[in-house]
């Protein structure tokens, strides 16, 4: 806890890449469970490493983060990029981003509690992600997914990998008192099913190419009580 720099309360909160837990350079097959990792620039900073950035191969993969507290970070409760991991039953509260998962793939976000984050889950260029059974409460935006056309020219990674934003399942989550549940930009083949929405200002905001977008709420499967339902295209 309390490993933070670049922070002045109410004035400046960049974090400057300080972190409670740093994992990088092909750090794989670890279990991180039952820890308090709060009030740090990032709670967790997980990065695949320079070799992955140059070659598009490898990653900091197949780690399990279970029942930890990643709260009160001025930047990201969890930052996990260019890798494949599982985040299960964690507490993620009052961060700028609860999870920042840029370029993550084949990852699972299961049974976590997100509360009062600016963006609870933010993933750019993500692929094959499962967001299942989480609770989002009081977040400004619960889930934001997107693709940027322009990527840094000095990165080898996008030269060797498909970096489209695609293939998400958002299943059985509860959204309570969030301003926006799903913001989806240039992301293909997202299926949202069996989620519940209570006192949510806007359910979805879609833009760009969202081919294959499906949202299913079967009668009796979930209670939907939006304050102002809106779909923007």
Task: Name the predicted role of every residue range.
Residues 1-19, 25-28, 41-47, 74-81, ...:
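Short glycine/acidic-rich loop motifs that flank beta-strands on beta-rich extracellular proteins
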Residues 17, 139, 149-155, 160-163, ...:
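Acidic, glycine- and Ser/Thr-rich low-complexity intrinsically disordered tracts
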Residues 20-22, 53-67, 72-76, 98:
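Right-handed parallel beta-helix
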Residues 31-35, 54-55, 76, 80-82, ...:
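Short, T/G/N/S-enriched strand-turn elements that build extracellular solenoid repeat scaffolds
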Residues 83-110, 114-121, 129, 187, ...:
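Internal alpha-helical scaffold/solenoid segments in large eukaryotic proteins
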């Amino acid at each position: 806890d309390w490993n933070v720099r670049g922070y002045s309360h109410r004035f400046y909160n960049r974090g400057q890449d300080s972190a409670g837990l740093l994992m990088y350079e092909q750090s794989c097959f670890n279990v991180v469970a039952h820890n308090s990792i709060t009030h740090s620039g990032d709670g967790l900073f997980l990065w695949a490493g320079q070799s992955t950035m140059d070659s598009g191969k490898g990653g900091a993969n197949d780690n399990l983060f279970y029942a930890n507290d990643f709260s009160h970070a001025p930047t990201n409760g969890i930052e996990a990029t260019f890798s494949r991991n599982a985040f299960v039953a964690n507490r993620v509260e009052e961060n700028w981003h609860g999870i920042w998962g840029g370029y993550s793939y084949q990852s699972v976000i299961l049974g976590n509690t997100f509360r009062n984050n600016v963006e609870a889950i933010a993933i750019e260029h993500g692929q094959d992600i499962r967001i299942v059974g989480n609770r989002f409460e009081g977040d400004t935006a619960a889930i934001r997914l997107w693709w940027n056309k322009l990527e840094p020219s000095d990165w080898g990674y996008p030269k060797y990998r498909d970096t489209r934003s695609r293939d998400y399942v958002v299943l059985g989550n509860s959204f309570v008192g969030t301003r926006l549940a799903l913001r989806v930009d240039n992301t293909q083949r997202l299926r949202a099913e069996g989620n519940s929405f209570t006192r949510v200002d806007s359910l979805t905001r879609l833009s760009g190419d969202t081919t294959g977008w499906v949202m299913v709420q079967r009668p009796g499967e979930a209670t939907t009580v939006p304050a102002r339902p809106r779909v923007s295209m």
